[in-house]
C-alpha cells in the first residue's frame, strides 16, 4: 500500500493561501515532558526514548537541563555522545555556569531563555527588562564564543508586547548571529489566529529561524503549533503523549500525523508512534486518555453498526488514516449499537459462520447483554453467545439453554 493510500489528504488545503512549510521537529519529552509532576526518567529510559526519536527522523532532541543535578548532566552528555543523527539540545538559564554545563555535555545547541513579559519581570525576576536582556546577551556571547549553536528563547512570549520581542530578537540576531529565536506560549493562552499573528510579525522582523513552543492549557497546543508553521515557524516543539507541565505540550504524534495529512510531509517514520507512546506511558506512569488522538485506546475502535459495516468494505470510510500508519491496530467492538451486517462481518472475521436465523438470535442476545452490563462484550463473551445460539437453533425438542455471561 502506498503512502497516499494510508490516509485521506485534506484537499481543502489546496484552496488555502499559506506559506510552504519549512519545518523541523524538536522533541522536548526528556526535558519539558519530565517536568510533568511526578515524572522522573532514569538514564536507561531517557536513552531508549532518545534512540526511538532519532530512528523516527526527529531533527532535534532536547535532552534535559544539565544544572538540575549531576545525574541529569551525565544523562544529557551520554545522549549527546550516542552518535545520533538528531542534534542534541539542552536548556540553560542566562547564566554563565549553565552554559558551562552545556559545554561539558557536548550538546549541539543550547537553549538560553529569559522571560520578557511584565508579569515575569515583576513577580519572578524582580528586575528590569534591560537587566534581563543584558544577562541573556552575556550568556549568548559566551556560548557562541565557545562554539555552541544558540537558541534564544522568550519564555511567556505570548504575554510579552510584540514590539518588545521584535526588538530583542533583532538585537541578538544582529549582535550574535544566533541560530534560532523561540516563542514560548508558556501558559497556553494563544489560539491559532493569534499564533499566526505573533509568528508572522516576528517572521517579518528577523531572518533567524523561529521556534514555537506551545502548552495545552486550552487544548489548542497542536493547532497552534500548525498555525505557527503556516506563519513561518521553522522548529516545532512537541512531547510524546503531550506530557508536560500542567496540561502538557503539543503532542508529537498529533503533529507528525497532521503534517502528513494536512501538508503532505511524510519524512518521519510514523509507524513507531504507538510503540513510542506505550514506552513513554510505561516510563512516565501516565496513560493517554482512551480517546486521545492517534494513540488512544479508542483511536481505531469502532462499535456503531453503520460504521463497522462500512469499515469492513473500506476502512477509510470512517478512519482518517489507517492504524498501520502509526503502528496501531483496528478493533471492531460488539455492543449495543452493532447492526446485523456489522456483526456478520465481525463473526466471520473470527472464524464463525451463522445462518440468518442464528444471526438474528445472536444480535438480540448481544443487545440484551450489553444493556444489562452497560458495556460492550469481549471476544470470549461473543464466542460463548455464538455457541449458545447454535445450540438453541438445533432442531431438537430439548429445552433451550438459558444464556448467561
From Swiss-Prot:
InterPro entries in alphabetical order: AIPM/Hcit_synth_CS, Aldolase_TIM, LeuA/HCS_post-cat, PYR_CT
Annotated keywords: Transferase
GO molecular function, one term: homocitrate synthase activity
Location of the Pyruvate carboxyltransferase domain: 23-274
Broad enzyme group: transferase
Keyword Transferase: yes
Keyword Transferase carried by entry: yes
A Pfam family matched in the record: HCS_D2
Gene Ontology biological process terms, A to Z: biosynthetic process; carboxylic acid metabolic process
EC annotation from Swiss-Prot or TrEMBL: 2.3.3.14, 2.3.3.-
Catalytic reaction(s) noted: acetyl-CoA + 2-oxoglutarate + H2O = (2R)-homocitrate + CoA + H(+); 2-oxoadipate + acetyl-CoA + H2O = (R)-dihomocitrate + CoA + H(+); 2-oxoheptanedioate + acetyl-CoA + H2O = (R)-trihomocitrate + CoA + H(+)
Pathway: Organic acid metabolism; 2-oxosuberate biosynthesis
SUPFAM superfamilies membership: Aldolase (SSF51569)
Transmembrane segments: none
Family recorded in the similarity comment: Belongs to the alpha-IPM synthase/homocitrate synthase family.
Stated role: Catalyzes the condensation of alpha-ketoglutarate and acetyl-CoA to form (R)-homocitrate. Can also catalyze the condensation of alpha-ketoadipate with acetyl-CoA to form (R)-homo(2)citrate, and the condensation of alpha-ketopimelate with acetyl-CoA to form (R)-homo(3)citrate. These reactions are part of the biosynthesis pathway of coenzyme B and biotin.
Name of the protein this chain belongs to: Homocitrate synthase AksA
Lineage: Archaea, Methanobacteriati, Methanobacteriota, Stenosarchaea group, Methanomicrobia
Gene: aksA
Amino acid at each position: 500500500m502506498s503512502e497516499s493510500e494510508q490516509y485521506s489528504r485534506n484537499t481543502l488545503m489546496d484552496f488555502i493561501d499559506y506559506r510552504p512549510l519549512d519545518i523541523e521537529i524538536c522533541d522536548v519529552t526528556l526535558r519539558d515532558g519530565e517536568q510533568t509532576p511526578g515524572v522522573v526518567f532514569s538514564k536507561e529510559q531517557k536513552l531508549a526514548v532518545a534512540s526511538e526519536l532519532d530512528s523516527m527522523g526527529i531533527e532535534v532532541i532536547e535532552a534535559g537541563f544539565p544544572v538540575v543535578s549531576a545525574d541529569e548532566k551525565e544523562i544529557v552528555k551520554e545522549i549527546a555522545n550516542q552518535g545520533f543523527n538528531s542534534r542534541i539540545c539542552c536548556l540553560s538559564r542566562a547564566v554563565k555556569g549553565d552554559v558551562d554545563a552545556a559545554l561539558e555535555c557536548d550538546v549541539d545547541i543550547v537553549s538560553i531563555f529569559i522571560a520578557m513579559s511584565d508579569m515575569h519581570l515583576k513577580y519572578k525576576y524582580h528586575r528590569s527588562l534591560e537587566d534581563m536582556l543584558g544577562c541573556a546577551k552575556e550568556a549568548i556571547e559566551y556560548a557562541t564564543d565557545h562554539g555552541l549553536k544558540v537558541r534564544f528563547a522568550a519564555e511567556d512570549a505570548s504575554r510579552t508586547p510584540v514590539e518588545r520581542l521584535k526588538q530583542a530578537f533583532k538585537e541578538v540576531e544582529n549582535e550574535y548571529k544566533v541560530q534560532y529565536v523561540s516563542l514560548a506560549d508558556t501558559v497556553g493562552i494563544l489560539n491559532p489566529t493569534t499564533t499566526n499573528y505573533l509568528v508572522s510579525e516576528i517572521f517579518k522582523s528577523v531572518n533567524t529561524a523561529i521556534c514555537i513552543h506551545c502548552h495545552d492549557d486550552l487544548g489548542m497546543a497542536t493547532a497552534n503549533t500548525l498555525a505557527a508553521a503556516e506563519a513561518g515557524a521553522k522548529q516545532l516543539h512537541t512531547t510524546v503523549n503531550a506530557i508536560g507541565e500542567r496540561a502538557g505540550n503539543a503532542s508529537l504524534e498529533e503533529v507528525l500525523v497532521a503534517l502528513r495529512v494536512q501538508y503532505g510531509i511524510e519524512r518521519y517514520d510514523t509507524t513507531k508512534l504507538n510503540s513510542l507512546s506505550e514506552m513513554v506511558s510505561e516510563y512516565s506512569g501516565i496513560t493517554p486518555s482512551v480517546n486521545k488522538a492517534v494513540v488512544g485506546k479508542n483511536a481505531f475502535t469502532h462499535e456503531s453498526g453503520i460504521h463497522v459495516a462500512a469499515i469492513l468494505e473500506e476502512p477509510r470510510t470512517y478512519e482518517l488514516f489507517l492504524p498501520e500508519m502509526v503502528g496501531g491496530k483496528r478493533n471492531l467492538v460488539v455492543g449495543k449499537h452493532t447492526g446485523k451486517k456489522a456483526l456478520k462481518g465481525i463473526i466471520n472475521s473470527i472464524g464463525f459462520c451463522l445462518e440468518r436465523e442464528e444471526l438474528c438470535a445472536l444480535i438480540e442476545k448481544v443487545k440484551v447483554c450489553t444493556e444489562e452490563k452497560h458495556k460492550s462484550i469481549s471476544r470470549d463473551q461473543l464466542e460463548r453467545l455464538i455457541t449458545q445460539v447454535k445450540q438453541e437453533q438445533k432442531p431438537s425438542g430439548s429445552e433451550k439453554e438459558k444464556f448467561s455471561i
